[in-house]
From Swiss-Prot:
This is ATP-dependent protease ATPase subunit HslU. It is found in: Cytoplasm. Signal peptide: none annotated. One of its GO terms (molecular function) is proteasome-activating activity. It holds the Pfam family AAA. GO terms for cellular component: HslUV protease complex. The gene is hslU. Keywords: ATP-binding, Chaperone, Cytoplasm, Nucleotide-binding, Stress response. Gene3D superfamilies: 1.10.8.60, P-loop containing nucleotide triphosphate hydrolases. It comes from Campylobacter jejuni subsp. jejuni serotype O:23/36 (strain 81-176). InterPro entries: AAA+_ATPase (IPR003593), ATP-dep_Clp_protease_ClpX (IPR050052), ATPase_AAA_core (IPR003959), Clp_ATPase_C (IPR019489), HslU (IPR004491), P-loop_NTPase (IPR027417).
Length: 439
């Protein structure tokens, strides 16, 4: 998608409040990708993305900015926690798995796009498969009259199938079952083995299953995709997308920084993870199920709160690979108020829509919203700062009784005012010990 940095920031403003610096830096980084692709192949190889380090406490919008952009622009995106690589008992276990995860994300992205493009062909394939079970083909040598009758019956059945009249009927279908797909705990390295067994024709089998037609339609989608779509071109496109448009968001990078003031036995492990990350961020080749993926032009966005450490506590080589740094602002009551009112699908709108399913119209008056924001802000100041996530806890506590008794208010309008907010939350926020457990 060809968007200017200003257009990117404008899009983000609908979902993330404030954080202008972070939005600007990411918008420029993404626009530079588009600019790079307009250059000659020789020059493209030399221009590497400027990786970004985002510094800010939890709940201020670090992940949301990157996730929203990747989704809007159709980029392969994954989020991983750097800290998980120190929890396994030995240094840097499978740090390359983040690249394999990105390859899978790119593959799914391209597959979904191709399925959408070829929707009519896929639907026709599924339709014919189901019709074969409902009305088996006639044997050879049947009279023209019988063939005409069969054709008419088939078209009537097809119309019923398309209209959903047969959705609750039960049929027996054959679906392919791969032995690798049945075990979700197999490591990502098995992707290459999966491709080999497909070629030699083992590892998968046809399984007969009885199910409703509406379920059969979904079950046959994968088989239809395998038969109709060009799998090699999908892999090739996915590899290209992952290499040139992929974004890896490394959260909690501060947890693997070795604080100069805090030396403990985990420090060698933390530094080991940093050194394992280094070649991937610098640019290396990683074997994935879609081929050898070069990480040279993947955009890495690292993020952390850095409460107990500083960015300078990362090893110098890794610091140098994240030249763009941006500090995200903490959220005060004004920012929290905007978060509750401005975004397209704000938290208050979500709760209103949920209760609308119970035929209850829920509204919040402006003073009540300001009071909710103040209480959330105060809770963040007096306890751990968890940013906008505090709003979820506060609103859940506020609406707890109403959600429980929603059926009693069916057909009515319920307005949350400042008085209700003070009654429900005032005593809790004043009692700090209680607030720590509830808010």
């Amino acid at each position: 998608m060809n968007l200017t940095p200003k257009e990117i920031v404008k899009f983000l403003d609908d979902y993330v409040i404030g954080q202008k610096k972070a939005k600007k830096i990411i918008a420029i980084a993404l626009r530079n990708r588009y600019r790079r692709m307009q250059l000659s192949p020789e020059l493209q190889d030399d221009i590497v993305p400027k990786n970004i380090l985002m510094i800010g406490s939890t709940g201020v919008g670090k992940t949301e900015i990157a996730r929203r952009l990747a989704k809007m622009m159709g980029f392969p995106f994954i989020k991983i926690e750097a800290s998980k690589y120190t929890e396994v008992g030995f240094v840097g276990r499978d740090v390359e798995s983040m690249v394999r995860d990105l390859a899978n994300a790119a593959l799914n992205l391209v597959k979904n796009e191709q399925r959408e493009k070829n929707k009519d062909k896929i639907d026709e394939f599924i339709e014919n498969k189901i019709l074969e079970k409902l009305l088996p083909p006639l044997p050879k040598g049947i009279s023209d009259e019988k063939q005409e009758e069969y054709k008419n019956s088939l078209e009537k059945m097809r119309t019923k199938l398309r209209n959903g009249n047969l959705d609750e009927s039960t049929i027996e279908i054959e679906i392919s079952q791969n032995m690798f797909d049945t075990n979700p705990n197999l490591p990502p390295e098995m992707g290459a083995m999966q491709d080999i067994v497909k070629v030699i024709g083992v590892g998968s089998k046809k399984v007969k299953k009885e199910m409703k037609i509406k379920d059969a339609k979904n079950a046959l989608k994968n088989e239809a995709g395998e038969k109709i779509l060009d799998q090699e071109s999908i892999k090739s496109e996915a590899l290209k997308r992952a290499e040139n448009e992929g974004i890896i968001f490394i959260d909690e990078i501060d947890k693997i920084a070795v604080s100069s003031g805090n030396s403990n036995r985990q420090d060698p492990s933390k530094e080991g993870v940093q050194r394992d990350l280094l070649p991937i961020v610098e640019g290396s080749n990683v074997q994935t199920k879609i081929g050898t993926l070069k990480t040279d032009h993947i955009l890495f966005i690292a993020a952390g709160a850095f409460h107990l450490s500083k960015p300078s506590d990362l090893i110098p080589e890794l610091q140098g690979r994240f030249p763009l740094r941006v500090e995200l602002d903490s959220l005060d009551d004004k920012a929290l108020y905007e978060i509750l009112t401005r975004p397209k699908n704000s938290l208050l709108k979500q709760y209103s829509q949920l209760l609308k399913t119970e035929n209850l119209e829920l509204e919040f008056d402006d003073e009540a919203i300001k009071e909710i924001a103040k209480i959330a802000s105060r809770a963040n100041e007096e306890m751990q700062d968890i940013g906008a996530r505090r709003l979820h806890t506060v609103i859940e506590k506020l609406l707890e009784d109403l959600s429980f008794e929603a059926d009693e208010y069916a057909g009515k309008k319920f307005v949350v005012d400042k008085k209700m907010v003070e009654e429900k939350l005032g005593d809790i926020i004043e009692n700090k010990d209680l607030a720590r457990y509830i808010l």
